[in-house]
UniProtKB/Swiss-Prot annotation:
EC number(s) from the headed UniProt entry: 6.1.1.16
Name used for this protein in its record: Cysteine--tRNA ligase
Quaternary organization: Monomer.
Assigned GO CC terms: cytosol
Lineage, uppermost ranks: Bacteria, Pseudomonadati, Pseudomonadota, Alphaproteobacteria, Rickettsiales
UniProt family annotation: Belongs to the class-I aminoacyl-tRNA synthetase family.
Free-text remark on how the cofactor is bound: Binds 1 zinc ion per subunit.
GO molecular function: ATP binding; cysteine-tRNA ligase activity; zinc ion binding
Coiled coil: none
UniProt signal peptide: none
Gene: cysS
Entries under Pfam families matching the protein: CysS_C, DALR_2, tRNA-synt_1e
Amino acid sequence: MVRLYNTLTKKKELFIPIDKDHVKMYVCGPTVYDTAHIGNARSVVVYDVLFQLLKFCYGKVTYVRNITDIDDKIINAASEKNSNIESITTYYIKAFHDDMESINCKKPTYEPKATENVDYIIKLIEHLLQSGHAYESDKHVYFNIESYHEYGALSGKKTDELVPGSRVEVNENKKHPGDFVLWKPANDIDYKLSSYWNSPWGEGRPGWHIECSAMSYAYLGKDFDIHGGGIDLQFPHHENEIAQSKSAFAGSMFAKYWMHNGFLTVNEEKMSKSLFNIVKVRDLLDSGIKGEVIRYALLKTHYRKPLDWTENVISDAQETLNKFYRLSRGLDTINIDESNAEISKDFIDALKNDLNIPEALAILHEMAAKINKMSNESEKLKLTESFVKSARFIGLLESSYQEWFTAGVSHQEIERLIDLRRAAKQNKDYNTADKIRDQLKQIGVTISDNEDGTTTW
């Protein structure tokens, strides 16, 4: 049985799908105006593992992760770069996909774009207007939070606490400071960049919050099982989604379970442009850090806890994965998913316990220690196959032993070093021969000298 912490009820609950034969989940995806940083990646990695677990336990799972491809930040990026919206979003959508693939994230079932669902958005706004939960003011359409009496159930914030400030837009056209925009009129930049649509309220574009309500409804219906995202989205974004969707569909629960992954800091400081400490996934990859190392580092801390990103986090992940890969030597790891090897039950049980990935990783370490002590080759092989298959379940050990340790090093270069070592030995320069052996070992190449004078690796 899967148990998940539900942010809405503030407790860990037994997960009971609305339809036991079809689990539905929605996760807020990227706003594509820049490349992904590690905070973005953490959310993707967490819900990627959840997706795999739910498929394992329940079979059919529909996972929707949206793309926000119209937003003030995107418009500003296009304007600053003297480009157009489509060029900006196309470029960053591809960059996002490339980066997430590099850290072994599988694709969701659907990945709708906001711009492709404007018709749904307009219909939802019309419905909210007709039911008295929204109003027009100065060519804008706003949601009336006082019309929804359960506002604040997710975040704990009440309507009388919402005063104009950093997270509440100051606007005298609103009935209440906490009212949020569903539709905004086009301005000069919108017309210049063609970032507007026709609507019953004039030319304009949707607000951010209504986009997710419309897309989740379009792909999952009015009720679904899990809504996920980063803790930074809990308020106001997710709170506003609930208000919109439950107001639009009387009797709807919208999302039954709400999940939020924790904040990510860098050296105990919040990531921000002003501190120049934003860590991009692409920069890490370009520096030579493997995607799987990034993934392990993001998984090591429980998803609900804050994660502090340091150099030690990366070095520990690299060291651990090197150890894990050494155990896989000689196995056909790429095709092991089709083998008869079983995923560790303890490993799966850890994941079923509110996606306790750190506990699952600890079980992998226990399996590794046991493998190293085993002398029975048959039993050792069986446990090693289970170890690798378990690790692959959460997106680790996706490469072969040789690919992992020789990435970026050609076979020709390895053979050249072996030839140099052989020549050094023939000249009785054993110091150089040992240095070359150590050099090969550092890149994961273990060599054996044969009686006939040849060397294998």
